[in-house]
Amino acid sequence: MQENIRNFSIIAHIDHGKSTLADRLLELTGTIDPKKMMPQFLDSMDLEREKGITIKLKAIRMNYNFEGENYILNLVDTPGHVDFSYEVSRSLEAVEGTILLVDATQGIQAQTLANLGLAKKQNLKIIPVINKIDSPIAKVEESVEELSNLLNVMPDEILRISAKDGTNVLEVLKAIIKDVPPPKHSHTPVNERENFRALIFDSEYDSFKGVIAFVRVMDGEISNGEKIELMATKTPAEVKELGYLNPGFSAQQKLVAGDIGYIATGIKEPGKVTAGDTIIKQFEIRKNPTGSKQSKFEIKPLPGYQEPKPMVFASLYPENPDDFDVLKVALSKLKLNDPALIFEQEMKEALGRGFNCGFLGTLHIEIISERLEREYGLNLVISTPSVVYKIIDNKNKEILIHSAADWPNQSTIKNMEEPWVSLEVIAPSNQMGKLMEILKSLKGNYVETNYLSPERAIIVFETPLRGIIANLYDKIKTASQGYASMNYKMLGFRSAKLVKLEILIAGQKEEAFSRIVAEDEAYFEGKRVVEKLKDVLPPQMFSVALQAAIGGKIIARETIRAYMKDVAGYLYGGDITRKNKLREKQKKGKKLMKQKGRVNVPTKAFLEVFRV
């Protein structure tokens, strides 16, 4: 039976037609009732459909009869945006082959190369496919040439399809069956039933069944009711239910090596079920062939996967302080299916209680915040995103800083480091000049330029991550009229000169506006923030000083002039001294207000400053 199983994924850049191709495969195999079929079937979230992107990893089992034999095709669908590359790495652990899909109207894009690198690392069989050949602006032969050079294959080995109208999609199905190898054991077990191992590549939470782990069975088999253990967290559990995904839960009696399916664990603590962990069976003591005792811990976990580490942080606060508990519950529920999301409670005087959250990138922030607003009815204040910094203090202690509020006194810092990335930008050759100007503004290091073809090139640039999260993607798209794409990978931490920029309003520090910036950019950033605050803060009865400071030293200042009320306006005629007395009294009152008064910063002001 294993010989007729094909486990595969589809990897592509965002909007290259991956979800549409998945739809055609579901139709051809008769997996979905035509009456229930809808565009982008596997993209179940409203956000996925609206944005035209895949966010969450999906898996589905298909059956297809080819040349008189029945084949089981397990498709693990993957996202295409750079922020969700960790989802791609999870899916590729579970398959033997992948379709590399390229849009004929755009050619190879940055995320295509990144995903291809992941597939090669896993030694997967790669099926190259050019999509959207029906488009009037398709550059089919140019795309074929690029892909042929990239993979070092003959042009006639590359399939040309239209996922939209179904042209040649049947050839893709045949290629999956013919070219993708069947599952192989990762080792030769002593006992097929006992040496069971399964890789968790995703999970979701069910209030009745507990955590449901989506798994690829690597070795052995597992049945309902058997006792299992999660190796990384040493968590014991019992199989409450197991089965296939097609696309709903289809309960079965057992899963065997090569299968992709689900296991309901009954575990009520989602943090104990982590993607990349290995599930084994519980056996206190058993014997190996030599007769000596063997512990269950001698079974090694499956290699390769590393848990994703958030590198971009932002604070989330409810506009209505009474919604704090709703936000807390909502974040907890979202984390069940999103292991890269982390959060911890924090408190700021101006905003109240909220959470400092870790994300994979700026799109990840956007997706989470929109889900919180749509699914839980929350209106949020979201701080300016920042990256994680590393400092070494005078006692040689290493500290990771996720928020400006955690930044220590500058005099106690011995060394500072920030994360750097290797950035790849793919664009038409005639637009390289404009793109180089943008990249130079990042203050990184130019590495090289490689040409995919005479018309398109790849710029490789090393730069601090903080420059990437500041709308670089939008700047590159705008400069190239939408033709450029980018991808980046982490290089680790490098030395940096950083300072904490503080904002004072009427002499009072507003911690919510504090941020970590490069020392040589502090003045420009401080000036930008106080100028923006001057535009958005309402005038008071007294003049308000807006100041940017570093370590108590003021580096930029703006002033909101006092709101002028004519206290003598109701007087007419008579002695001018009466008016002067009233105005002098007003002047003294304003001076007292300025000394004792505190400016209430409206939520709108936070939103405006965080947005720039």
Predicted features by range, described:
Residues 1-108, 115, 203-206:
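P-loop NTPase switch module centered on the Walker A-proximal segment
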Residues 151-283, 298-315, 319, 344-349, ...:
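Conserved catalytic-core segments of large NTP-driven translation/proteostasis enzymes
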Residues 16, 28, 81-82, 105-108, ...:
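Conserved nucleotide-binding/hydrolysis micro-motifs of P-loop NTPases
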Residues 92, 97-155:
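Conserved C-terminal guanine-recognition region of P-loop GTPase G domains, centered on the G4
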Residues 31-57, 84, 153-159, 177-198, ...:
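Active-site phosphate-binding and catalytic loops of NTP-dependent enzymes
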Residues 15, 21, 52, 75-77, ...:
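Residue-level signature of catalytic and energy-coupling elements of molecular machines
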